[in-house]
Amino acid sequence: MDPKYQRVALNDGHFMPVLGFGTYAPPEVPRNRVVEVTKLAIEAGFRHIDSAYLYNNEEQVGLAIRSKIADGSVKREDIFYTSKLWCTFFRPQLVQPALESSLKKLQLDYVDLYLIHFPMALKPGETPLPKDENGKVMFDTVDLCAIWEAMEKCKDAGLAKSIGVSNFNRRQLEMILNNPGLKYKPVCNQVECHPYLNQSKLLDFCKSKDIVLVAHSALGTQRHKLWVDQNSPALLEDPVLCALAKKHKRSPALIALRYQLQRGVVVLAKSYNEQRIRENVQVFEFQLTSEDMKVLDDLNRNFRYVVMDFLVDHPDYPFSDEY
């Protein structure tokens, strides 16, 4: 089998490609560019495509996937597509309609994976970040287990093959896992993960529960000003990472991606640059030594790019716990 298509078994019997293409782009990127780069990613060998309601690009991503199916490049079952439930739809009765709305935009019959995007409920409605007259984001309170049960119904209805969570800490995962009515465990927890924030404790916990850890922001984020402090360190310029890149004659990005794969983490590579999209698939063409891995482990400084500081007062804010 082509190494590009390596997959990991999920706890529900489905399989997820270990390398994914992240489709998020800042609003200033023209939406038609989303179609082009998603097609490019599929042509380069990506079979796992990650998007979300919040990214406001599902129409374009769906168009790209359908055009690659139509031209015979791939079949629908070759593509593993992820969407995410946004925080303004955290009412049990809103969950399935939110997924159906994504499917309508995508013009697909099902998603391979549907995730709870963040564990924090916001005031229900169509505005992604609802604010009061003082400009403060409006929170909502909700039982996450009730939302999980609504996710389970989406799986039973065949609208999502697998269901999981994103940006959950250990305590929040345990709450779902210990829910007396639990029907399906989350198959994964998608979190920020890179050499500066290697999530080793959360990774060990997830492995112990047969939950896959998926790394977003694996290259240190696109540093979009809404989400990321502009003074934060640039991961891909790290001297240790660059030295390893030189040693292996690869880019620093490839070292960061390979690091995750060798830890058993599914990794999302986000790029809108044609050359880098093609390059990122080369992650299967080399290996890091155990010494390399140790050096990369030592870069950990528990540094988080996506802090969501405007939600820090939310009762379910996930990043105050150690992990």
From Swiss-Prot:
Q: Where does substrate bind?
A: 117
Cited InterPro entries: AKR, AKR1C, Aldo/ket_reductase_CS, NADP_OxRdtase_dom, NADP_OxRdtase_dom_sf
Q: Which residues does the entry assign to the active site, renumbered to this chain?
A: 55 (proton donor)
- Per UniProt, what is one GO molecular function of this protein? testosterone 17-beta-dehydrogenase (NADP+) activity
Which residues are listed under the site Lowers pKa of active site Tyr? 84
Its Gene Ontology biological processes? lipid metabolic process
Q: Which cysteines are joined by disulfide bonds?
A: none
- Reactions catalysed: chlordecone alcohol + NADP(+) = chlordecone + NADPH + H(+); a 3alpha-hydroxysteroid + NADP(+) = a 3-oxosteroid + NADPH + H(+); a 3alpha-hydroxysteroid + NAD(+) = a 3-oxosteroid + NADH + H(+); 5alpha-androstane-3alpha,17beta-diol + NADP(+) = 17beta-hydroxy-5alpha-androstan-3-one + NADPH + H(+)
Record site: Important for substrate specificity: 54
Q: How does it assemble?
A: Monomer.
Protein's job: Cytosolic aldo-keto reductase that catalyzes the NADH and NADPH-dependent reduction of ketosteroids to hydroxysteroids. Liver specific enzyme that acts as an NAD(P)(H)-dependent 3-, 17- and 20-ketosteroid reductase on the steroid nucleus and side chain. Displays the ability to catalyze both oxidation and reduction in vitro, but most probably acts as a reductase in vivo since the oxidase activity measured in vitro is inhibited by physiological concentration of NADPH. Acts preferentially as a 3-alpha-hydroxysteroid dehydrogenase (HSD) with a subsidiary 3-beta-HSD activity.
Q: What is this protein called?
A: Aldo-keto reductase family 1 member C4
Q: Which species is listed as the source?
A: Macaca fascicularis
Upper classification of the organism: Eukaryota, Metazoa, Chordata, Craniata, Vertebrata
